């Protein structure tokens, strides 16, 4: 008799995706982040659902409802901090996942890569709207500053901003719609994840060498299931440690002050995972130019497959490209640091240099160095 997992209409889909899926035998721990992101999404949806049962999306009560969750709801503080720090873990895994794709040339699977970029935008939008919900000072002013950037769009900008706000400033209507979209978007993300996996399973996984692995495949279960479970345990241990020992480490103390439209915080900045993009935005003196640079800082990932000039897929055997890759990582760390600093000398100039370097490495230096490496190999 054939096993039910191979005949049942639903189980056979799961079987072909997670059990009998042929996978390259050489996948390193860098391939764990896809499944870790799945766990992050599940944790965020579950904790978010329980938080939404107690949260009120009204300007008069939003801040107090979050305080009520932390003080009066059973394990409400755990839920709240799991959700807030879970977002940080989500972005750590996201950036490492994208970095892995860049390093090992996974972007040559263009459909999977492009859906991934769409997912990145969707998760960023979700995180931004979630940050507004506690209705603290940084929530309110962050929402005001970031939504106001849309006014830089010629002709329709001002109308667009007022349409998003639902009035002439960030107010009750804005908070209510942000809550609605913050609740809805993770389910759209979950649907996009399915499409992401669908396209991935059309081609099969890449591997660290970048060489086709068809002759050397192993079943996903038990080899990679057990490896993924180890990854889950490590990540959930790190998240638990963060939540239980220093839950406010990655947050902003200003967000414990209720939102006040009459009092601007001394330094408005987003959560740490957006600081690199915020630094790029601020490094251009022109408003529209800054907004374009902000969008392009993520959208630039879409042109990476087009600019792939190397005859090898992975950077594993390309030391010059490796140097540029790690330089890019250093530039991103620099931008993240600059995004959290005030707008004054010398931070402004450091941010501008780092922003130019960021775009230069991806658009100019990497394609050129790949051509040089091809020549060095006498291909």
Curated annotation (Swiss-Prot):
InterPro entries in the cross-refs: Cyt_b/b6_C (IPR005798), Cyt_b/b6_C_sf (IPR036150), Cyt_b/b6_N (IPR005797), Cytb/b6-like_sf (IPR027387), Cytochrome_b (IPR030689), Cytochrome_b_C_euk/bac (IPR048260), Cytochrome_b_N_euk/bac (IPR048259), Di-haem_cyt_TM (IPR016174)
Listed CDD domains: cytochrome_b_C, Cytochrome_b_N
Q: Which cofactors?
A: heme b
Give GO terms: molecular function aspect only. Answer: metal ion binding; ubiquinol-cytochrome-c reductase activity
What's a GO biological-process term for it? Answer: mitochondrial electron transport, ubiquinol to cytochrome c
Q: How are cofactors bound according to the entry's free-text note?
A: Binds 2 heme b groups non-covalently.
Membrane topology per the entry is:
Multi-pass membrane protein
Which residues are heme b b566-binding?
97, 196
Record-listed a ubiquinone binding positions: 201
GO CC annotations on file:
mitochondrial inner membrane; respiratory chain complex III
Which Pfam family is an annotated match for this chain, by its short name?
Answer: Cytochrome_B
Q: Which UniProt keywords apply?
A: Electron transport, Heme, Iron, Membrane, Metal-binding, Mitochondrion, Mitochondrion inner membrane, Respiratory chain, Transmembrane, Transmembrane helix, Transport, Ubiquinone
For this UniProt entry, which segments traverse the membrane?
Answer: 33-53, 77-98, 113-133, 178-198, 226-246, 288-308, 320-340, 347-367
- Quote the PANTHER family the UniProt record gives: CYTOCHROME B
Assembly information from the UniProt record: The cytochrome bc1 complex contains 11 subunits: 3 respiratory subunits (MT-CYB, CYC1 and UQCRFS1), 2 core proteins (UQCRC1 and UQCRC2) and 6 low-molecular weight proteins (UQCRH/QCR6, UQCRB/QCR7, UQCRQ/QCR8, UQCR10/QCR9, UQCR11/QCR10 and a cleavage product of UQCRFS1). This cytochrome bc1 complex then forms a dimer.
Function comment: Component of the ubiquinol-cytochrome c reductase complex (complex III or cytochrome b-c1 complex) that is part of the mitochondrial respiratory chain. The b-c1 complex mediates electron transfer from ubiquinol to cytochrome c. Contributes to the generation of a proton gradient across the mitochondrial membrane that is then used for ATP synthesis.
More details: Heme 1 (or BL or b562) is low-potential and absorbs at about 562 nm, and heme 2 (or BH or b566) is high-potential and absorbs at about 566 nm.
Protein name per the record: Cytochrome b
Cite the source lineage.
Answer: Eukaryota, Metazoa, Chordata, Craniata, Vertebrata
Gene transcribed to yield this protein: MT-CYB
């Amino acid at each position: 008799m054939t096993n039910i997992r191979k005949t049942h209409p639903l189980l056979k889909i799961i079987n072909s995706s997670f059990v009998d899926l042929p996978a390259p035998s050489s996948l390193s721990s860098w391939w764990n982040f896809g499944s870790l992101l799945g766990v992050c999404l599940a944790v965020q949806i579950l904790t978010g659902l329980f938080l939404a049962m107690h949260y009120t999306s009204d300007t008069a009560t939003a801040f107090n409802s979050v305080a009520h969750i932390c003080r009066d709801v059973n394990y409400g503080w755990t839920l709240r901090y799991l959700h807030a720090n879970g977002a940080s873990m989500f972005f750590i895994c996201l950036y490492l996942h994208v970095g892995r794709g860049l390093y090992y040339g996974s972007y040559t699977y263009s459909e999977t890569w492009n859906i991934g970029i769409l997912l990145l935008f969707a998760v960023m939008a979700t995180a931004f709207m979630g940050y507004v919900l506690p209705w603290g000072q940084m929530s309110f002013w962050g929402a005001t500053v970031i939504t106001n950037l849309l006014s830089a769009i010629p002709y329709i900008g001002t109308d667009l901003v007022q349409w998003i706000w639902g009035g002439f400033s960030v107010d009750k209507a804005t908070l209510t719609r942000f809550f609605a979209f913050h609740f809805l978007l993770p389910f759209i993300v979950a649907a996009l994840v399915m499409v992401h996996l669908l396209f991935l399973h059309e081609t099969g996984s890449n591997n660290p060498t970048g060489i086709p692995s068809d002759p050397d495949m192993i079943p996903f279960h038990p080899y990679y299931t057990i490896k993924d479970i180890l990854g889950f345990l490590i990540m959930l241990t790190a998240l638990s440690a963060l939540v239980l020992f220093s839950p406010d480490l990655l947050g902003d103390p200003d967000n414990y002050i209720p939102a006040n439209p009459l009092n601007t915080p001394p330094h408005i900045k987003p959560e740490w995972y957006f600081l690199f993009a915020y630094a790029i935005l601020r490094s251009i003196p022109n408003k529209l130019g800054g907004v374009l640079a902000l969008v392009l800082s993520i959208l630039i990932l879409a042109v990476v497959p087009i600019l792939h000039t190397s005859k090898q897929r992975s950077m594993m055997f390309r030391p010059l490209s490796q140097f540029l890759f790690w330089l890019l990582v250093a530039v991103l760390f620099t931008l993240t640091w600059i995004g959290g600093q005030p707008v004054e000398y010398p931070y402004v100039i450091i941010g501008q240099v780092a922003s130019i370097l960021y775009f230069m490495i991806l658009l100019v230096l990497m394609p050129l160095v790949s051509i040089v490496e091809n020549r060095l190999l006498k291909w």
